[in-house]
Amino acid sequence: MLRQIAIADAYGAGFEFSSQEKIDNHNDLTRYMAHDLTGSCGKYTDDTQMNIALAELIASGESWTPETVANHFVDTFNRDPRGGYSKRFRAVLDECSSGQDLLKSIKPESTRNGAAMRSPVIAYLGNEEAIRSHCELQASVTHNTPIATQSSQAVALAAYFGLSQTGTVAEIPSFLKSHGVNIWNYEWQGESTVQAYDACSAALTCLLNCRQLSSLIIECVALGGDTDTVAAIAVGIAACYTEYEKDIPEKLLDSLDEVTYGVAFLDDLNNQLHTSLTSNQAQD
């Protein structure tokens, strides 16, 4: 999951709120594009980094509390500061040395997509009740609003539905409905804003329409808007389904511009998640 999220994120970042002309001319998965504002190219953003933070929390076996969640957000950022965060949240993180600092500094009233984008990895908790409660807890740290919480739960549960081999992609809406988080527009069209409802609706629409990771990324980016987040969410979920062809071009994998926290690191962390999942399932 994590390497796919990173590639989708880094690829989508090159088209984030770009012109339709740029998307039409270059959205073909042949190479990463530079971000229009920062010039960054082939580097993943906050979408991947925050999945890493929660993945490391899961793998550590620590108890989830607002402070432990916040600690992992701060520690992961401080060891590897990078772009993609909103200006306001980035300014807060720049001043934090601990989770306690973050909790004191932030007003968690956002309805944006930050809680959703970091939720695919929560599927590795391997238990529907635990997934729902942990989504609510982690969302409360930065996005303590009903829509943000529901978006987090929808993303993690959709990923779990595939990871547990319980159902198919086409059955995701029914599965989410059974958990009371089926409020999304599955026929989304046009740009996705940074709002949780938009990003979740856009990602799920594209997810239901495709069965190949390559076509999924292209379709997410083709919508325009917050392309890196929509692609990262959709691909994070899709990676959990055997019916999805894992056909991301090797060229994108090889040219991901990450050294310390690149593909090898992500694969090792993903292996730790699988070990944690097996342990959680054995306990159930």
Predicted regions and their residues:
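Structured, active/binding-site neighborhoods that engage oxygen-rich ligands
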Residues: 1-284
